Amino acid sequence: MSVAQSADERIPLVRRAWARCVARLLPLCATDTRTLSSRNFRDVSEEHFRRFIYNRYTEPQRHYHTLEHLEEMLGHLVAYEAEHGWHGAYKPAMAEESVSSSTPPPELLTGEDSVAYEWTGMVLLLSVLFHDVVYDPTRSDNEEASAVVAAEFLETMQRESELASNSSFGAVAAVSAASPTSMVASCALPPASDGRGAEDDVSQQHPPFSYSEPPLLWVDAQATDFVRTSTMSYILKTKEHLSVEPKQPLYLTVSAGGGFTSAELRRGSDVVQQSRDDPLHVFLDLDLTILGHPDEDTYRRRYAENIRREYSHYSRADFLRGRAEFLRGFAQHPQWYKTPYFFRLEARARHNVAHEVKALTAELAEVPVAC
């Protein structure tokens, strides 16, 4: 088994999110007119997954901002859509469309709301996949650069789609005239032979030449602009999470021991279940879920220690001082999570961060002045 295949087994949700996006960006028949060689849907998809996602998120300077970070975010998105959902405002991003709550009310079937209903799920997935696609701890414009790469990806997919559509039309029409059944075969994807399961098999998720296939993004100029601008905007908002105001203020209560609790927002509570959340807020909350991990040791190993590795170019004292200062500033904000569903993590997140600051401060006190 190759290293890439081994990595793929750890990121089934990343693969599923990618497949769901590409199915709305590329036609299932693709012929490369530049080389006059046949390139099927799977080949084109895999080529760009390696180029835009895998190769970037496996760069050596990354320890926390990796494919596993995306996998965790998508796992929380799956749980959110299963337990809460969009109350009919948007098609689900990861859940199957058969979920009853996804049926739109009549007033959402036209205009801008219709575009948002149809395409917000893709915006969420693209934002997750691309929000850290550029990550260099020594530069301050990672978010801006990541947004540019996301736009570049969409432009690339649009060109690929146009090439495939233009070159495939004549070929498919000729085959169709000779044999209608051969036309379907000419667009079929090869069986999966790379060791990945059915979850990752694009041909099973999106059967070839199906008249039930949803239209590609590019057939609607308004939708194309919506996806491009919204995805870039979402990514740019991760530069300063807490500058985005929540829809409603949510409050922690102080426990008898002096800590915080958000027990009033238990799963299934009216506040959680009745909230109609802004997808941007959900996306930003997904990015911060690691802070509220229920196990403090896991928080330390998977987040705090890996962030420290990413900033190993700083001296020990400079890192300890800078990290503690950053977290103290973060803690001053009254509300970290913007949606009631994820606000349930707030008390635990503050506990984890407070303990990290305490550990950083204690270690800094032991560092010789010259370090």
Task: Identify the meaning behind each predicted range.
Residues 48-79, 133-134:
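Active-site flanking loop/helix segments enriched in acidic
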Residues 140, 154-166, 208-226:
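Inter-helical turn/loop segments and adjacent helix faces that build the functional surface
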Residues 73, 119-137, 146, 233-239:
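His-Asp-centered metal-binding catalytic motifs of divalent-metal-dependent phosphohydrolases/nucleases
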Residues 116-122, 142, 227, 278:
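Secondary-structure capping and boundary motifs in well-ordered enzyme cores
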Residues 73, 142-157:
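An active-site-proximal "capping" alpha-helix that borders the catalytic cofactor pocket
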Residues 27-56:
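Short alpha-helical hairpin
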Residues 2-25, 82-118, 130, 159, ...:
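Divalent metal-dependent phosphate-bond-processing catalytic cores, especially two-metal-ion Mg2+/Mn2+ enzymes
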